[in-house]
Amino acid sequence: MRPILLSGHERSLNQIKFNRDGDLLFSVAKDKIVCAWWSANGERLGTYNGHQGAIWTVDVSPNTVLLATGSADNTVRLWNVKTGECIKVWDFPTAVKRVEFTPDGSRLLAVTEKRMGFLGTIAVLDINYEDLEAQAEEPSLRITCTESKATVAGWSYLAKYIIAGHEDGSVSQYDSKTGEQLENVQAHEFDNLISDIQFSADRTYFITASKDKSAKLISSRNLAILKTYVADTPLNSAAITPKKEYVILGGGQAAMDVTTTSARQGKFEARFYHKVFEDEIGRVRGHFGPLNTVAVHPNGTAYASGGEDGYVRVHHFDKPYFDFMYEVEREQLRK
């Protein structure tokens, strides 16, 4: 499995995202630019320029018409994917740490930072596709996190709920129409922040990654913890693979905690776990520094990781990856 190395950022990666078709990959880093790449061969399509600070988050609409980014310059920007022009800028009082479109692309959520006397919020913006220039000025819904700020958030199936991961290690479920909190579960160890949340293809369950060195598979409906994957290093990102029953975890010691430069020492590898049996089944090395973000191709044929080293590595899976099975799984097939 030879990786394609994408070198377009000068600083560490924050988030990478495939579009729904999987032919494009978008990456954002601490260097103010958004890069778009062909996922098949790693060719760079272009960049989206305009942010004045580190870009924390990116998402692309389901129809690949719009791109949303959230940045440390306290704005959410909406871009035309094809032309690269910035269509709309929404200003917030603090930095924006996560953006995500609903499964139908009609709404966009933005998670804002708790800072300078402002509480952390989750804002929901309505998106207009009829006239791209005419976007709403104000959020249609604002959820304020009075207890622990939200660090990440996403939409459940049918955009019925907003699921948020918090700084204190808890996961919340909000009604996406009213903003009312319906559930709150202490999914991870107290005060170990949730660094990533990614959903299954049908959005009925999701995976969280946390600084407590574990990832959890959780139901969107009632926040029941279905599976736990234990790693030996703080995790920055986790993703669920379609086609095969695996999950991919990415992490590594924080850059400031690393005392030796050996890549093995810092545990800078993508880890593959069996989704059902919770066993670790393999690792993929390569990054020089922690993995900050992992993403899986929607067809399950490839995955990409973005690291503290400023590189995005795209791995297209080989045949053995798809052939690998537990004895139990083989028996099921024989039946």
From Swiss-Prot:
InterPro entries (UniProt xref): eIF3i, WD40/YVTN_repeat-like_dom_sf, WD40_repeat_CS, WD40_repeat_dom_sf, WD40_rpt
Top-rank lineage group of the source organism: Eukaryota
Subunit structure of this chain's protein: Component of the eukaryotic translation initiation factor 3 (eIF-3) complex.
Protein name per Swiss-Prot or TrEMBL: Eukaryotic translation initiation factor 3 subunit I
Subcellular location: Cytoplasm
Function: Component of the eukaryotic translation initiation factor 3 (eIF-3) complex, which is involved in protein synthesis of a specialized repertoire of mRNAs and, together with other initiation factors, stimulates binding of mRNA and methionyl-tRNAi to the 40S ribosome. The eIF-3 complex specifically targets and initiates translation of a subset of mRNAs involved in cell proliferation.
Organism encoding this protein: Aspergillus oryzae (strain ATCC 42149 / RIB 40)
Family statement drawn from the similarity comment of this UniProt entry: Belongs to the eIF-3 subunit I family.
Alphabetical list of SMART domains matching this protein: WD40
PANTHER family to which the protein is assigned, alphabetical: EUKARYOTIC TRANSLATION INITIATION FACTOR 3 SUBUNIT I
